[in-house]
Each structure stands twice: as C-alpha cells, then as structure tokens.
C-alpha cells in the first residue's frame, strides 16, 4: 500500500486511515459532518497527493494533446486550465482530468500539466505516453513523491493571500500561477480549482514544503478533512466520481458532460466519430439528481424504480449535511429524466420515494 508524504502527519493528527486506490488515505479526522461544515463555512484542507500529475512538453503541445480530448484546448491560454475527459474509440470515458496551460517555456516549446485520478494514474500515464511521445512530446511524472494539497472553503483564498502576501483577487476560477508562501523553500504551483463546490485552491509542493505547509495550516486552525467529507462535498456540488458516475461504457452526453464535447472544432480526437453519432441520436440514458423522502441513503448500484419496475441505477448517494436530506445521482432512461419525475430507489428491499431535481444540489450563494 502506498503512502503520501503527509501520511504520518495525517495519522498522528487523528486521521482514520483506509485503503483507497492503492494508497493509505485518511477517510476522516474529527468527523465527516464537522469536516464538511468547516469547508462550507470556513476552510478545510485535504491531502490529495494520491492523484497523478504529468507534465507534457514540446512544440505545440495543445495541438498534439488535442487528439486525446473532446474539448477545444485552444479555448484556454497560459495561466488557464480546463476540466475535460479522456475517451476510448467508442466515445466512452477513460478518465476525467484537468489540463493546465503553462504557456511557452522557450522559443519552440510549450508545456501543459495534467492532473489525473489516482485509480487511473498508472493506466492513464502509459496510455498518454504511448500516444504523445511518438508525436514529439515528452511526458514526465512531476509529482515525484511530492504533495498535492487542496485548501477549500470561503476563507481559503484570503488565507492564501495572508500566507503569501499576494492579492489573488485577479486569479480567476481555473486560473493558476506560482506563489511564494512564507516559510517554504520553493515556489508553489497554485490553481484556483477544487472538488467541493467551494472557492479554494489546489497546491503542488515538494514533500518537505508540503509537510511544512500542512503543519502551518494546522497551527492556523484549518480543519484537516478526509475522503469522506470530500465525497459528500463533491456530491452536493454534483461533481462526478470516475468509476461510479461515469466509466468506459458511458459517453459524455449520458454522463451529463455534453458541454465538454466541442464537435464544432475541426480537430480529430479519439472517439470523435462515436460522439458525432451519439450527438445525432441523443442519449438513451441521462445522469440526474434525486432527492429522497425519509432518511434512508441510496448507495452506488441501488436499483431505481418507476412504477415498481427497475429502470436505472444510483451512481452515487449520501446524506447531505448541508441540506439535511438524502441525495443521489442516478443513471436513468432519458424519457424519465424530466425535472419533477417521481421515481423510487430500492433500499434494503423497500421502495423509497425519490424525485428528479436540478443539479447541483448545492451552489455557493
């Protein structure tokens, strides 16, 4: 089992460690609901060092990487980033990722950074290398046993401003830059991104700097948060979890990610023909939000029923600490995906009433 450079700090700081995607990671510290509310109301921090980080360098790297993603990479420029997906030949989703444009590194070459999911990191890296290196790009794992730390919540950016002495009001959502943070030896790659539905930043640091910053943040009263709160936060924000809400058999239209597909651009990409056909016919199934009556929680793969008959499955479900009711994402036939449709979810042999509602369940006012 792999361990991040923050493992000991998490364990000795009260983290309950569990296996996740081949890593020992903290599932919670003080308690899921307390951690969840810290992020919604103030600020929390997460060790996300299990995720993969690749750097691609070469001539025209966006043109070359464009072969692998359906989103027009020329919509972002240096200092900007985009969320997108990797596809297979059938238009199914191999993984989701964020691509950061670092701009030119010399007269002839540019660079991109890719952050990929932990569970897919090895297969993604091999697959990307196999396609990008023959096309002239170098692909380097730059995490190098370093730290990825997510600082999330309405007080995250003010706290970073305090630690760096910089005004970050001009850093837009999905913008990124290097920051000098007091007490750290190296500059810190800082992106205004996250997986919680709150403002915040994700930071890439050396192992030593990551440990120092984690300790600094603890001293400032920042709540350490585990995978449990990360999941409830992202689910309230209706953010997808790869392997549950989408997979290699789900295309972006079926996953509610059709906005990532830019078929109007001339560039070819893996899965383009399949997505052109899918766009023409429309999806047979859709990912929807559900609110359930009562307090029973719908979990992954629980059957969704219509008039007592199975019609789909729950992809993710939880108790929402913010809304104080059960919520879920579910894959159901397009014909039943209209807002307000009454369905039910089979939970421990009982049909629990549920209603199709607008996503996300929570949005920062």
From Swiss-Prot:
This enzyme's EC code(s): 2.1.2.10
- Residues passing through the membrane, by range: none
Gene Ontology cellular-component terms for this entry are: cytosol; glycine cleavage complex
Which reactions does this protein catalyse? N(6)-[(R)-S(8)-aminomethyldihydrolipoyl]-L-lysyl-[protein] + (6S)-5,6,7,8-tetrahydrofolate = N(6)-[(R)-dihydrolipoyl]-L-lysyl-[protein] + (6R)-5,10-methylene-5,6,7,8-tetrahydrofolate + NH4(+)
In the record, biological process GO terms are:
glycine decarboxylation via glycine cleavage system
Q: Which GO terms describe its molecular function?
A: aminomethyltransferase activity; transaminase activity
Name the top EC class: transferase
Q: Which SUPFAM superfamilies match?
A: Aminomethyltransferase beta-barrel domain (SSF101790), Folate-binding domain (SSF103025)
User: Which terms are listed as keywords in the entry?
Assistant: Aminotransferase, Transferase
Q: Which domain of life is it from?
A: Bacteria
Which family is this protein grouped under? Belongs to the GcvT family.
Assembly description: The glycine cleavage system is composed of four proteins: P, T, L and H.
Main role? The glycine cleavage system catalyzes the degradation of glycine.
The record's listing under NCBIfam families reads: gcvT, PRK00389.1
Query: Which HAMAP family does the protein's record reference?
Result: GcvT
The protein depicted here goes by the name Aminomethyltransferase
């Amino acid at each position: 089992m792999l361990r991040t450079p923050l493992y000991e700090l998490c364990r000795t700081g009260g983290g309950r460690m569990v296996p996740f995607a081949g890593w020992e990671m903290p599932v919670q510290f003080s308690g899921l609901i307390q951690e969840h509310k810290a992020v919604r109301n103030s600020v929390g921090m997460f060790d996300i060092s299990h995720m993969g980080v690749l750097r691609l360098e070469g001539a025209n790297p966006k043109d070359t990487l464009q072969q692998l993603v359906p989103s027009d990479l020329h919509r972002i420029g240096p200092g900007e980033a985009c969320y997108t997906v990797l596809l297979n030949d059938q238009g199914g989703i191999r993984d989701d990722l964020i691509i950061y444009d670092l701009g030119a590194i010399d007269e002839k070459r540019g660079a991109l950074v890719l952050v990929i999911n932990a569970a897919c990191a090895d297969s993604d890296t091999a697959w990307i290398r196999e396609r990008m290196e023959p096309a002239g790009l170098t692909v380097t794992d730059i995490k190098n046993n370093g730290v990825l730390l997510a600082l999330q919540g309405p007080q995250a950016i003010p706290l970073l401003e305090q630690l760096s002495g910089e005004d970050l009001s001009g850093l837009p959502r999905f913008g990124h830059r290097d920051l000098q943070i007091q007490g750290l030896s190296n500059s810190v790659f800082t992106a205004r991104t996250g997986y919680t539905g709150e403002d915040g930043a994700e930071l890439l640091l050396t192992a030593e700097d990551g440990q120092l910053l984690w300790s600094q943040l603890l001293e400032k009263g920042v709540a350490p948060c585990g995978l449990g709160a990360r999941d409830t936060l992202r689910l309230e924000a209706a953010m997808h979890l790869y392997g549950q809400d989408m997979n290699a058999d789900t295309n972006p239209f079926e996953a509610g990610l059709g906005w990532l597909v830019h078929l109007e651009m001339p560039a070819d990409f893996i899965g383009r023909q399949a997505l052109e056909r899918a766009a023409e016919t429309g999806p047979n199934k859709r990912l929807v939000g559900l609110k359930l009556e009562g307090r029973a929680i719908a979990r992954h793969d629980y059957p969704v029923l219509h008039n007592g008959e199975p019609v789909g499955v729950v992809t993710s479900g939880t108790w929402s600490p913010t809304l104080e009711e059960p919520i879920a994402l579910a894959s159901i036939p397009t014909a039943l995906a209209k807002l307000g449709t009454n369905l039910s979810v089979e939970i421990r042999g009982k049909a629990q009433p549920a209603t199709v509602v607008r996503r996300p369940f929570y949005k920062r006012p």
